[in-house]
């Protein structure tokens, strides 16, 4: 089966049964929270034999708890081929191509500035309560424990469409430049289950996150969600993801298409206004969603907002200069 621990951190920790052990897909933001999530699972299932850890993408809330999930000494040798890594009996760590490069770029090169700004965005230092910190739309908030990183032992590229991990087949879909520069969805045929990483989240996401990061490509984001729908929807019973809750059955197709549609709409409408000569601030004030998207509860503006996403698209194509020489 597939099990998720939600509410322990900003993201979910997902535990997937293999023939003789477990895959952990995303390991939360900090070591302590991941230890607690793993302990919850072990209280129910006994000691977990972790065959593989998968990082869905290069944001810290998905890899920072690595040392709470596994011991560094139990990690497979990255110099070995992937087949030999699995055969070694050690834990294999998988991530999308470019993961380490972008994890370092975001969390080392700009890490100090970004961490400071994240405190403002998420209200990390606020007291919990109705007049302080509640949640942040995609999860409970930013945790403040020990952030760790264990480098992937193998990065998934386009030349690796699928792997079998301890008897469980996993089919990958790379989605670079969407919610993160390096990201991947995954499909589990045995469970008829589609993992959408952070490409679908039960809320409108950020095309530009206010903590600071590279602007995301709304057009590609929509494209990859539609591709996932076309490749996997007809053989999927459940869609699950790294934030918020799963979706089942007949609602899956609509869920994927509505999520793709909102990013495509914001992208195209912003370009339309840009080419008419409006500035970034003017577009942010003008743009509005059609009723069909406005009324969809899982694409509401609980995390990202329409105005700052429109500004993100303007920035991506035209940059900060408003072309006013005065």
Give, region by region, the residue ranges found by the protein language model:
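Divalent metal-coordination and catalytic microenvironments
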Residues: 1, 16, 26, 41, ...
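Conserved beta-strand hairpin/beta-sheet module of binuclear metal-dependent hydrolase folds
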Residues: 2-48, 184-188, 192-198
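Active-site metal-binding motif and surrounding structural segment of the metallo-beta-lactamase
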Residues: 20-21, 32-92
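Active-site neighborhood of phospho(di)ester-bond hydrolases with catalytic His/Asp-centered motifs
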Residues: 25-27, 51-61, 94-97, 175, ...
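Active-site environment of divalent metal-dependent phosphoester hydrolases
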Residues: 58-64, 100-103, 179-181, 201-205, ...
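Metallo-beta-lactamase
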Residues: 87-90, 94, 98-176, 220-229
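Active-site-proximal loop/helix segments of hydrolase catalytic cores
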Residues: 169, 173-227, 231
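Divalent-metal (often Zn2+) His-rich catalytic cores of metallo-beta-lactamase-fold enzymes
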Residues: 193-194, 203, 219-282, 286-290, ...
């Amino acid at each position: 089966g597939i099990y998720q621990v939600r509410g322990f951190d900003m993201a979910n920790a997902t535990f997937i049964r293999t023939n003789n052990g477990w895959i952990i897909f995303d390991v939360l933001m900090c070591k302590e929270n991941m230890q607690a999530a793993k302990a919850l699972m072990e209280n129910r299932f006994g000691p977990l034999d972790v065959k593989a850890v998968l990082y869905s993408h290069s944001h810290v809330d998905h890899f920072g708890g690595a040392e709470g999930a596994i011991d560094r000494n139990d990690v497979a040798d990255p110099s070995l081929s992937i087949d030999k890594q699995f055969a070694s009996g050690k834990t294999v760590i998988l991530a999308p191509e470019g993961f380490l490069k972008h994890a370092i770029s975001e969390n080392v090169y700009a890490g100090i500035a970004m961490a400071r700004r994240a405190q403002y965005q998420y209200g990390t230092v606020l007291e919990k309560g109705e007049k302080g910190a509640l949640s942040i739309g995609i999860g409970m908030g930013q945790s403040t424990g020990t952030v760790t990183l264990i480098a992937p032992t193998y990065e998934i590229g386009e030349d690796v469409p699928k792997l079998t991990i301890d008897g469980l087949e996993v089919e990958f879909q790379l989605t670079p430049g969407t919610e993160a520069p390096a990201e991947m969805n995954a499909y589990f045929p045995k469970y008829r289950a589609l993992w959408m990483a952070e490409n679908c989240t039960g809320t409108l996401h950020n095309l530009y996150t206010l903590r600071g990061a590279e602007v995301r490509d709304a057009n590609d984001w929509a494209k990859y969600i539609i591709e996932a729908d076309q490749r996997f929807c007809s053989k999927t019973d459940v869609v699950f993801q790294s934030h918020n809750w799963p979706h089942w059955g007949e609602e899956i197709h609509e869920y994927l298409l509505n999520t793709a549609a909102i990013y495509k709409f914001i992208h195209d409408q912003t370009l339309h206004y840009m080419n008419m000569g409006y500035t970034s601030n003017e577009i942010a004030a003008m743009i509005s969603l059609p009723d069909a998207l406005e009324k969809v509860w899982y694409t509401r503006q609980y995390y990202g907002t329409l105005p700052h996403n429109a500004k993100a698209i303007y920035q991506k194509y035209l940059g900060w200069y408003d072309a006013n020489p005065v």
